[in-house]
Amino acid sequence: MLFVSLCKARAGTPKENIARRAQWQYPEGTQPVAEYWLQTTDPTVIVISEADSIAPMMSAVADWDDVFEFTVVPAIAAEEGLELAKQMMQG
């Protein structure tokens, strides 16, 4: 299952946060698909991850909730969404 995390900066300096990120590893059970660092404040970071459940996402949020305000939502790729739409229209 794909999850998209929208991360809004809360505290800390970019230098501190980058140093912290360099040492941090994604939780076990999480496969990062993409991580984007934006030149905006909301969101500051977008992460797309794959996991079997929400549990690893909750762990990542707990690791970073002092630095970012999170919105985590399940997502599907456009191709999968189009296939599901075709199935719904047929049934």
Which residues are covered by each model-predicted region?
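Conserved, structured core segments of small domains
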Residues: 1-91
